[in-house]
Each structure stands twice: as structure tokens, then as C-alpha cells.
């Protein structure tokens, strides 16, 4: 498999998981409106249970579809679902960590945090999936370079679709 294609194919569940809460989110905030000891919200209204579990579900379904399209990539449905679930969970945990850090830095909801927004979910996803499946270092480096561009393009698209209030 072409290394560039493989890098994208591998990380696709995380990309979908990270972007799905924009459409699927809403409802009860993960932090239930509670504040941290600094008096600021833990995560904020933008991180909801519906978005979190919706994102994990979408990412896991994407991985399942990938297996059905190319069964040889993972070798088994069990491994495909496991990797997709861990990539998705990792992406959303990384996004939550980013929100936590942004609240501690007193950054308002939706405010862009260059690097944190683009690499936090990616690095966390890769770490979570590491026990089941990895990709070569060169592919990881490629993803570190292209993910900020893809993230920006996805945000502009979501803004134009009126799914987001700001294009970042």
C-alpha cells in the first residue's frame, strides 16, 4: 500500500471522530457546567456527551466500513473495530485535554489554539491505538505535517455549512 494512502487510511477513524461532534453534539456538557479550582469551566459547553459518544461511534463505524472495503488491511473485523475504537476514543480524549488546557489559559470557546487543536487529537489517537496497531514513523511525521492543513480545511467547510460559528 502507498505510504501516503496508508497514513490517511489508518487515521481516518480519528479524523471522522474528531469532526463528528460539530454535527452530532449538543446537549449536556461533559463537565456538567462545573468549574475547576481556578473558577473557570473544566471543558466548557462545546464538549458534550452526545458529541463525545457520537464521535466515537462514527469513528468506529468508519473503521468497520474500512475493513469491509479492504479486509486485508486489518486482517480481522475484531482488530479493525478495536483500532478504530481506540483511534476515535484517543482523538476525543486528546480534544478534551486541549479544551481543558485552553480553559486554564482563559481562551474562550472556539478560540484557535494553533498546534493544540490540530496535533492534540492526532497524537492522543496514535497513542491510544498503539497497543493494537501502529504505522511507520515516516507516516506519523507525514500526518503531523498534513493534519493542520486538513483541520483548517475541515473547519472552513463546517463554517460554510453553518455547522460552526467561526472558520477555525
Curated annotation (Swiss-Prot):
It is a multi-pass membrane protein. The keyword Ion transport does not apply. It catalyses: 2,3-bis-O-(geranylgeranyl)-sn-glycerol 1-phosphate + CTP + H(+) = CDP-2,3-bis-O-(geranylgeranyl)-sn-glycerol + diphosphate. Keywords: Cell membrane, Lipid biosynthesis, Lipid metabolism, Magnesium, Membrane, Phospholipid biosynthesis, Phospholipid metabolism, Transferase, Transmembrane, Transmembrane helix. GO terms for cellular component: plasma membrane. It is an enzyme of class 2 (transferase). GO terms for biological process: glycerophospholipid biosynthetic process. It is found in: Cell membrane. GO terms for molecular function: CDP-2,3-bis-(O-geranylgeranyl)-sn-glycerol synthase activity. Signal peptide: none annotated. Catalyzes the formation of CDP-2,3-bis-(O-geranylgeranyl)-sn-glycerol (CDP-archaeol) from 2,3-bis-(O-geranylgeranyl)-sn-glycerol 1-phosphate (DGGGP) and CTP. This reaction is the third ether-bond-formation step in the biosynthesis of archaeal membrane lipids. This is CDP-archaeol synthase. The gene is carS.
Amino acid at each position: 500500500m502507498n505510504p501516503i494512502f496508508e497514513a490517511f487510511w489508518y487515521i481516518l477513524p480519528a479524523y471522522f471522530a474528531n469532526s463528528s461532534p460539530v454535527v452530532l453534539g449538543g446537549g449536556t456538557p461533559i463537565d456538567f457546567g462545573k468549574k475547576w479550582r481556578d473558577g473557570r469551566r473544566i471543558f466548557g459547553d462545546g464538549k458534550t456527551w452526545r458529541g463525545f459518544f457520537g464521535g466515537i461511534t462514527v469513528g468506529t463505524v468508519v473503521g468497520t466500513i474500512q475493513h469491509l472495503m479492504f479486509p486485508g488491511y486489518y486482517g480481522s473485523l475484531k482488530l479493525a473495530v478495536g483500532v478504530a475504537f481506540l483511534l476515535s476514543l484517543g482523538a476525543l480524549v486528546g480534544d478534551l485535554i486541549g479544551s481543558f488546557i485552553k480553559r486554564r489559559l482563559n481562551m474562550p470557546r472556539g478560540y484557535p489554539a494553533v498546534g493544540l487543536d490540530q496535533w492534540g487529537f492526532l497524537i492522543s489517537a496514535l497513542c491510544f491505538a498503539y497497543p493494537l496497531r501502529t504505522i511507520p514513523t515516516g507516516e506519523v511525521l507525514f500526518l503531523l505535517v498534513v493534519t493542520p492543513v486538513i483541520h483548517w480545511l475541515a473547519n472552513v467547510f463546517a463554517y460554510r455549512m453553518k455547522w460552526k460559528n467561526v472558520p477555525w
